Amino acid sequence: MTLRLNDLKPADGARTERTRVGRGIGSGLGKTAGRGHKGSFARKGGGKIKAGFEGGQTPMQRRLPKIGFRSKMARDTAEVLSYQLDKLDAGDVDFAALRAANLVPSRAKKAKIVLKGELSKKFVLKGVAATAGAKAAIEAAGGSVEE
């Protein structure tokens, strides 16, 4: 038998007819049409409740107290420890390089190098502050600090 376009049909079970609900007791989905009896889910538009609505109980966002705020006086300077700096490649280090290396959080506007650990590479700091101890360690390793 040859295959013809007019003989093509989908495989068995590939296309099922949409179940029509509320069309008589014999269908198995008559009367309440699978919605049960009464309640919000039985009504049209039922089940659509606001996010955070807890059925009339005081919702979580109103039960818990308000906490904290973002202070305008907050420190916007990130501390970078000298041993973290040593993980970078030797050379020029500026604020953008520190941010690219994920040593400075995105909220910080400035950075300051703090001495902790040893420095083995030569760094030239540009536009980054350093403590007196960190400055001495950088210069001892052959680097410099330009503010």
From Swiss-Prot:
Residues 1-20 have a biased composition (Basic and acidic residues). Residues 34-47 have a biased composition (Basic residues). Part of the 50S ribosomal subunit. It comes from Xanthomonas axonopodis pv. citri (strain 306). Gene3D superfamilies: 3.100.10.10. The gene is rplO. Binds to the 23S rRNA. Residues 23-33 have a biased composition (Gly residues). Keywords: Ribonucleoprotein, Ribosomal protein, RNA-binding, rRNA-binding. One of its GO terms (molecular function) is rRNA binding. GO terms for biological process: translation. Residues 1-61 are annotated as: Disordered. GO terms for cellular component: cytosolic large ribosomal subunit. It comes from the Bacteria. This is Large ribosomal subunit protein uL15. Belongs to the universal ribosomal protein uL15 family.
